[in-house]
Amino acid sequence: MLKEFKEFALKGNVVDMAVGIIIGGAFTGIVKSLVGDVLTPPLGLLLNGVDFTNLFVVLKEGATPGPYLALEQAQSAGAVTLNYGLFINAFISFVIMAVAVFFLVRGINRLRKMTEKPPEPAAAPDTKECPFCFSAIPVKAVRCPNCTSQL
């Protein structure tokens, strides 16, 4: 059983998948930082200084009544909130991740096509059909060996 597990774990596909998951986790952190620290602040400035992380709707007030200026205030007061600003950040992250994966897969597919050998042309047939008896005969035959017809 240990031998079977070792064979499974050391297969190329399993190792490749593990590397992909690790790199994907690191890439997720980079994309989250790109969205939260680089893209949404200028976008917020264009929208009169809106901070997307603080875009929320209070569904039910908490122990201390509102208004709450920041999401952290509402959450610390125990308010139930609908955090659509965090959803916008997550959606932007998803779009960036999807575009990055699309271009990565597209590049890999192009490389794969470049390294693939073109298919070999089909060999010319070495037999043909006799028009009189319909049996298979060599292409170069001038007389059918079965019905002795002149071809």
Curated annotation (Swiss-Prot):
It comes from the Bacteria. Keywords: Cell inner membrane, Cell membrane, Ion channel, Ion transport, Membrane, Transmembrane, Transmembrane helix, Transport. PROSITE patterns: MSCL. The keyword Protein biosynthesis does not apply. SUPFAM superfamilies: Gated mechanosensitive channel. One of its GO terms (molecular function) is mechanosensitive monoatomic ion channel activity. It is a multi-pass membrane protein. The chain crosses the membrane at residues 19-39, 85-105. Coiled coil: none annotated. One of its GO terms (cellular component) is plasma membrane. Pfam families: MscL (PF01741). It is found in: Cell inner membrane. Channel that opens in response to stretch forces in the membrane lipid bilayer. May participate in the regulation of osmotic pressure changes within the cell. Belongs to the MscL family. Homopentamer. This is Large-conductance mechanosensitive channel. It comes from Chlorobaculum parvum (strain DSM 263 / NCIMB 8327).
